[in-house]
Design a protein with these regions (language model features):
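Glycine-rich phosphate/diphosphate-binding loop of Rossmann-like nucleotide-binding domains
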Residues: 76, 81-101, 159, 163, ...
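Rossmann-like adenosine-cofactor binding region
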Residues: 234-303, 309-311
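Solvent-exposed alpha-helices and their adjacent loops that cap or buttress functional pockets
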Residues: 14, 57-62, 98-99, 124-126, ...
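Short, ordered loop/turn segments at secondary-structure junctions
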Residues: 71-73, 81, 110-111, 136-139, ...
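Adenosine-phosphate binding glycine-rich loop
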Residues: 160-161, 284-392
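General beta-strand structural signal in soluble alpha/beta enzymes
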Residues: 107, 133-136, 157-160, 191, ...
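N-terminal ligand-binding/catalytic initiation module
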Residues: 1-157, 377, 383, 387, ...
Length: 392
């Protein structure tokens, strides 16, 4: 970001003094209104909720409220900057929830990197919320935190860095395959990056029918038996790279139909793209500098190029997913956001790009396409009902 843009961002945040605020819904302008909204009238809904805790969704705002939870350990590209320093991002996330899907959200920035403490904190607060969005928590802690919270909370828990990224990337993949005449079951996908996002994208792709997946970390292709794998990567090796391809990213990407980058600038070269299948699909999502620039990928033979940036076509932007996903989950009071719901969200996003308009520069809707959140919410709510996690 240019220095003048950085200063402008600072100036605006100083002017705003926060991007969200609490606004009252009940009129309190007379003694009578005060008596209804607070004492003594407030006792009646309290007693109802005491009789049936689920009535907290009826008599309070809980059913539209999401906790945006971070420990500040993996904030954007800034790293472990701490919970307070992560607050501007969490406020921004809350603002996006409200703007795109009318979901109320509140930041919870926790002063701990301990899994037990984070899980216990969120578990104890879960009764105040209708859902939990985990944000900017480093891998591999985020996997354990998400898994355990799903076990102990009766409200949906969603890690956007994993699951939101996976949904949007898979939506783009659906249309890129349609554009290039490919079937998901027939493609070879190679990943650069074995963190939370990469593994989650690969997992959703596998669920959607992709069979040939290779994930590369800094040491090259991951496969069963490779030295230096942590427990998360050991598990990943059981369902990826069944042919045990070894070697660097350059070796793994040969003949691949799709490259997915969630790693570092410059990780993919034009020479690597030239070794891929004809009309390859390149998703270079490192920010702010992608693994390869779109024009370079296209010049090397790619048919479709997408990035995480708004100044290029085909932006892989999580705002296409998380507002609508939570809107749909909250609308049916879902107890979980499961794989069925995420797959439904991906197909809903992809479906907004029809055959007539689909092109190399348009395989995913834009961030401000007002059709997206309602379409995603409807698909997610339907999938929640069909998979048995809806409570309405």
């Amino acid at each position: 970001m240019a220095e003048d843009a950085k200063q402008y961002a600072l100036d605006m945040h100083k002017q705003w003094q926060g991007k969200i605020e609490v606004v009252g819904r009940a009129p309190i302008t007379t003694p009578e209104e005060l008596a209804v909204a607070y004492t003594p009238g407030v006792a009646e809904p309290c007693l109802k909720i005491q009789e049936n805790v689920d009535d907290s969704y009826t008599y309070t705002r809980r059913g539209n409220l999401v906790a945006v939870v971070t420990d500040g350990s993996a904030v954007l590209g800034l790293g472990n900057i701490g919970p307070e320093a992560g607050m501007p991002v969490m406020e921004g996330k809350c603002a996006l929830f409200k703007t795109f899907a009318d979901v109320d959200a509140f930041p919870l920035c926790i002063r701990s990197n301990d899994v037990d403490e984070i899980v216990r904190t969120v578990q104890l607060l879960a009764g105040s919320f209708g859902g939990v969005n985990l944000e900017d928590i480093s891998a591999p802690l985020c996997f354990e935190i998400g898994k355990r919270l799903k076990e102990v909370c009766d409200i949906p828990v969603f890690h956007d860095d994993q699951h939101g990224t996976a949904v949007v990337t898979c939506a783009a993949l659906i249309n890129a395959c349609r554009l290039t005449g490919r079937e998901l079951a027939d493609i070879k996908v190679v990943f650069s990056g074995a963190g939370a996002a990469g593994i989650s994208i690969a997992r959703l792709m596998k669920r959607m029918g992709v069979k040939d997946i290779i994930i590369c970390d800094r040491k090259g292709a991951i496969y069963e038996g490779r030295d230096g794998l942590n427990p998360v990567k050991e598990e990943v090796a059981t369902w990826t790279n069944q042919n045990k391809v070894a070697g660097s990213l350059a070796e793994a990407v040969k003949g691949a139909d799709v490259f997915v980058g969630v790693s570092a600038p410059g990780a993919l070269t034009q020479d690597m793209v030239r070794t891929m299948a004809a009309d390859s699909i390149i998703f270079a999502c490192a920010n702010p500098v992608p693994e390869i620039m779109p024009d370079e990928a296209l010049a090397a033979g790619a048919a479709v190029a997408a990035t995480g940036r708004s100044d290029f076509p085909n932006q892989i932007n999580n705002v296409l997913a998380f507002p609508g996903i939570f809107r749909g989950a909250l609308d049916v009071r879902a107890s979980d956001i499961n794989d069925d719901m995420m797959e439904a969200a991906a197909y809903a996003i992809a479906g907004l790009v029809d055959d007539e308009h689909r092109s190399a520069e348009y395989v995913i809707p834009g961030a401000f396409d007002q059709r997206v959140a309602p379409a995603v919410a409807e698909a997610v709510a339907k999938a929640a009902r069909e998979s048995g996690v809806a409570r309405l």
